[in-house]
């Protein structure tokens, strides 16, 4: 296999464009899972789709390389679905509109889904190539963004017969990270007493247009958090006068700094 960097990039981006056309919100990955399954079968790969819609795709070793160790290429199919204020976007039905300015890809008013669409796209491109390789397995899981329920449900037998696992969900360019990873979700509840408002004046306090970012990758960057700003503002106001709080809300995605 002898390909130029441009040929490889064009091939990966073509696979990514396929993914961008398919809505794939967390816990709604059936359509994209079915698409990838059929596409991998068309490459001559063997495919297992489990009840969670995780995919296990096996590419046989090249001739003469059967004794080489198995390598797993792993990514996830779901994406964080957010849109700018005023943008009409339904994460269950709307495709992602990609804008390519020649240097960067971005989406038109929504999240792009490169996490982890570009990782899945790279793996799908690799599965089509003819080169000297041992057995390759691509594993694509569901619901990584909200709870990793796909990874938790994956049968361990698909991991134990491989020597290497390469996760294609890193945030750093041109870098490999040797580590393990995990996540913890914390749900907190507090009982409150509702009552009819006594004050006639109502005010809406909005914090927007902040930097934002991924709560894992950018949590140490010191970016302002809209929820914290609102809480601090309410606390300051309450020290000076009595207020009644009707509601407070933020982005639905757990892993986005609001």
Residue spans for each PLM region:
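Conserved beta-strand termini and adjacent loop/short-helix elements that scaffold enzyme active sites
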Residues: 50-52, 141, 248
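Short alpha-helical patches at coil-to-helix transitions and adjacent helical residues
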Residues: 33, 116-120, 227
